[in-house]
Amino acid sequence: MLRKAIADIEAKYLRTDLPEMRAGDSVRVHTKIKEGDKERIQVFEGVVIAYRKGAPGSSMFTVRKVSYGVGVERMFPVHSPRIDKIEVVGHGGVRRSRLYFLRGLQGKAARLHQEEGPGAADAAHAAPTPA
């Protein structure tokens, strides 16, 4: 009874405009930042290294980027009202759900193979046709 009431209240605050994303994807997260009495949008662009799905209100994802040679990670609640929008820039071809190994890599070694568009993975593995 109480759980249903809590779920009904939480349902009002859940986002419905979420893009399909997973670990390895390059994303651009637009967050609302309040400075004094003004509010502005700040963009954080990087690679999703973890996507934790739990109860609808507790899902979170971690985005990592390297800024001026320093690795920066930021955790975002998926349904946060501070997130204005999430754009998926590219899909990374990874076989892991948590990419914490990227923390120890530098330079080109820390880059992920990017897939372009839907079905790009299928086209890459298709056998070439003889001419």
From Swiss-Prot:
Family matches, as Pfam families: Ribosomal_L19 (PF01245)
GO CC annotations, alphabetized: cytosolic large ribosomal subunit
Top-level taxon: Bacteria
Keyword Ribonucleoprotein: yes
One GO-annotated biological process of the protein: translation
Keywords of the record: Ribonucleoprotein, Ribosomal protein
GO MF term set: structural constituent of ribosome
InterPro entries, per database record: Ribosomal_bL19, Ribosomal_bL19_sf, Translation_prot_SH3-like_sf
Function of the molecule: This protein is located at the 30S-50S ribosomal subunit interface and may play a role in the structure and function of the aminoacyl-tRNA binding site.
Family: Belongs to the bacterial ribosomal protein bL19 family.
Protein name: Large ribosomal subunit protein bL19
Gene that this sequence comes from: rplS
